[in-house]
Amino acid sequence: MQRRFSTRLLSLTLLLILMLAAVALGGGQAAAQTDAATAKPLSPLHPVFPMLDADGRNVLESGAPVSTMQTCGSCHDTDFIASHSFHSDLGLSSMTAPGQVANGRAWDTSNGLFGKWDPITYRYLTPAGDERLDMSTADWLMTLGARVVGGGPATTSRNGEALTTLAPDAASPETNIRNADGTISAWDWSESGAAEMDCFLCHLDQPDHAARTAALAAGDFGWANTATLAATGIVTQSTSGWTWNTSAFDAEGALLPEYVRVQDPTNANCAQCHGLVHTDAATPLTLTGCDTTNPQTATTGQVISGQKIAESGVNIVDKASLSRAWDVHAERQLACTDCHYALNNPMHAQESDTTRPSHLVYDPRRLDIGEYLERPNHNFARGQSAQFTVAPELKDTMRRCESCHTVASHGSWLPYVDRHMTVLSCESCHVPHLYAPAIEKVDWTVLNADGSSVVSCRGTEDINGGIDALIEGFTPVLMMRDNIDGNPQLAPYNLISAWYWVYDDANGAKRPVPLADLQAAWFEDGAYAADLMAVFDSNRDGALDETELRLDSDAKTAAVAARLTAQGLDNPRVEGEVQPYSINHNVTRGEWATRDCQACHRDDAALNQPMQLAGFTPGGVTPSFVNDANIANSGDIVQGEDGALYFQPAPEQAGVYIFGSNRISWIDWLGLGIFLLTLGAVGLHGGLRFYMTLRNPRPKPELKRVYMYDVYERFWHWLQTVAIILLIFTGLVIHRPDMLGMFNFRYMVWLHNMLALILLVNAAMSLFYHLTSGAIRQFIPRPYGFFDQAILQAQFYLRNIFKGAPHPMEKTKDQKLNPLQQLTYFWLLNVLLPLQIVTGALMWGVQQWPVVAGMAGGLPWLAPIHTLVAWLFATFIVAHVYLTTTGPAVLTDIKAMITGWEDVEVHGHAETHPEHA
């Protein structure tokens, strides 16, 4: 029995072992099969497709470079896409003769990268007919290929012909090239191929931008798009060229699903050409100086990253306290395409106000998704940046901040929200500081030892210090942006100044000196020319440091000009320009955004802080702003006491009046002068009265007690007095917050408005009372005897009061005012008070009735008038209070205005003046 049990147990054990072995073997085979298979394709909805060459043949058969136009064109209308993309066109379609570009430089030939000269990259795309070649079309593609998506001028000539059909010609800038030794040779486009619009660059998850750029720099234009696939495993590179990987294709010649890595463009795709984008939250972000391989970051300091600045690898001053993200939108996982979408994308498309029927607020009709995928418009929604002028008809096509955000939350702390939103762009407060360096100056008047320009950056002291260089960042300058809708706004900018040499060609046309000629003027046998060293090397150490390598004397300028003249360049001279670069990213919120009213509303406000353009002025030439930037005159270029060149903001030049910051000096001096003269006159007059009273005491006059002021008269008088005094005080805080910084500006604005409302209501009720009661008559001068009695009253104040003489006019309940008082109140109540109310109301209502306020001149006119009248009211109060002391006793009139009862002098001749009885 036991043996049978043992045998059965052994059998079960063996069976279990066999089953486990089978499972293990099967599992191992399954695991092996899983390892052999690649992960799921990135885009399961995108079908597999063959790679086709320019002739439409499969590249596996031809071994030729891939044609994106043919490959992607199997399903998508690539001709439509390429012709509807300013990224591809780059200004080719707007190309014209030099100097004919609207608001461009004298030598610009288009408004895009192909034809618009950039002093940072310097090289000039030579137009046909120019005597000197700087950069031909092939040179342009080799030099700037890292920022060229292909198509447009990379495939098409300036006359619209395919580049590959042009015959090599050393005399044409479209079919020649300038060699390193300065010689010019023909370029054969049929051999190099052209660079089609590279769909892979934006629509693959891992495009090899470096390999593509290297192919373009080598002149292998036809293979550039193929090189973009280097990291996908579809193609490999060897010394003999590029080879297609047959294992990446199925038996029918189409890509295997796992190699179809097509996707919507991501931030990383955009970053290849634009600027620094960091998406890996686990890896600290680093950056190096003003790296021009990230042009947007180098020119603006903008970094697209959701990482907290404190967690980055950048060496920033007080970094530990910077708990904010580099960019709040990147932190919230927004992509570039969420704002810069295809204009016909059915999810985002919005019709222009000029074409949408006026009765429609929203048009629900959209492209079918299939129609959109076949013909997506690659003209992307864009903003109004100052530096990018290509395709101006597409500016302001993107949704802005207000499309997604409401300003309601600002109402809890920001007065005049609508007015602020009208004058200020959102970025003005929400991009208060950039924490990456940016280019400040590019100086091509001198050259570094490697033949490059001298560049200085703002926000860091060591632009060549690597990733450990200490960075402070910088505060952008606010300038008035001319918006497409005609409503200008203050917006943040970085300003890059540039100096360079220009010359006159044989036709008298101005051109920038070609780089090769500039280098030939500066160097001999790879070293600085001896005659230049004799002038520049002040310490005679055989090298040029940064204090020597600068055009800061007439002798240096003349020496370089002579060397350029020797190169055959006519009339070489230095010119300078300033290019504003718009800043729209690196947005922050909450405590990191500007929330302090006095950031703008004071003399030394950040709004008025100058931005340095250069530490000195190369060649003594003051630069001017480029003409094609969408900015209005809102500042001046000035030289500081330290010799540096600055841009000094002055928003008032563009019609912006900022309380507490802007004021008209002569208005203040005039008002203050009148006030002080009155105060001095009162002091002198009162002192003489006191002195004469001590010498000749005035005999006590006969008095009678009269109920002079009713309760309401006293109420409105004291209420008006308190309101006016507090209005003057709060107005002074608003006008000069720098002098009274202990008071909260926002609360003073609110209190000023409330007091103005009280004054207005009180004045209206007082007018109603005086009209209905008939008391208004005492304020109206009567012609009969008015001037004679006015003279008598003036004589009393100027002479007789010092003798102790009685008042010439008897004061009664029905006639409280003497002729001079009537005249004063006539102007006060009929001119000054209405003027102050009207100007104040228009200033308050500038956001409710901007058109009406604009018809009155806007704040630049209303505020100074309001200020001057306020000075006159302050002057009136001083005179008025003093004159109340001229009664029988010093406090008689004031007591009367408190109790209503007044002791008045008895005049025996009162009946002779019935008009004042």
Annotate the PLM regions.
Residues 25, 29-73, 77-81, 91-696, ...:
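C-type cytochrome heme-c attachment and multiheme electron-transfer modules
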Residues 2-14:
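Bacterial N-terminal signal peptides that target proteins for export
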Residues 18, 432, 882:
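Catalytic metal-binding/acid-base residues of hydrolase active sites
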Residues 86-88:
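Early compact domain cores of eukaryotic multidomain regulators
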Residues 628, 634-661, 668-917:
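Membrane-embedded alpha-helical bundles that constitute the cytochrome b-like, heme-associated redox core
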Residues 8, 58, 901-905:
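A broad, structure-centric signal for solvent-exposed, well-ordered loop/edge residues
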Residues 11-24:
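Bacterial N-terminal signal peptides
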Residues 19-20, 49, 535, 724, ...:
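Exposed boundary/loop context
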